[in-house]
Amino acid sequence: MTIKLIVGLANPGNKYLLTRHNVGSWYVNQLANNYHVSLINKSSFLGYTGYLNIGKRRIFLLIPTIFMNYNGQAVAAIAKFYNIMPEEILIAHDELNFLPGYARFKYSGGHGGHNGLKDVIYRLGDNNNFYRLRIGIGHPGDKNKVIKFVLDTPLDTEQQLIQHAINESVLCTSLMFQQNIAYAIHQLHTILK
């Protein structure tokens, strides 16, 4: 199976642009920049969209412009329009259980308390069989501080580590286009130990 849609989960607007919760959108923006693709706000897909032409394949990009807890609406809208199956989707999102500088590809699984993922699973018909790119942001150490933590900007040192993980993830995504998903997963997991 090949990836046909890459989504960076996000909250909308400048207020949230640089927050930890939006690191998935940082990844999609970096990927678009590397391939010289402009993302355009498309209201029918509830987000910024564009596509990459890789050989004979077209891979769609999406950054939702609705709040994180409803990002699944945007994913479902574009997937339905282009007839993209859940297993052909890669969702990039922030991961509290990983330290900054760490990222991992994963296939399937639960939402782990991430409301954006929870909505994606729900909107895809309670189907969790899609790929994820989990980008580490760290944990505040107290579950009562999580909401404020994810909606804050990372410290400068954390930002550098997160950006490094995103850069490596984008390189490995390019390997996925050239080789296959298994190869990209192996490379990313080898680079970011």
Curated annotation (Swiss-Prot):
EC number, UniProt record: 3.1.1.29
A matching Pfam family: Pept_tRNA_hydro
Binding site for tRNA: Y16, F67, N69, N115
Keyword terms, alphabetized: Cytoplasm, Hydrolase, RNA-binding, tRNA-binding
Entry's Gene Ontology molecular function annotations: peptidyl-tRNA hydrolase activity; tRNA binding
Family membership noted in the UniProt record: Belongs to the PTH family.
Protein's UniProt name: Peptidyl-tRNA hydrolase
Organism: Baumannia cicadellinicola subsp. Homalodisca coagulata
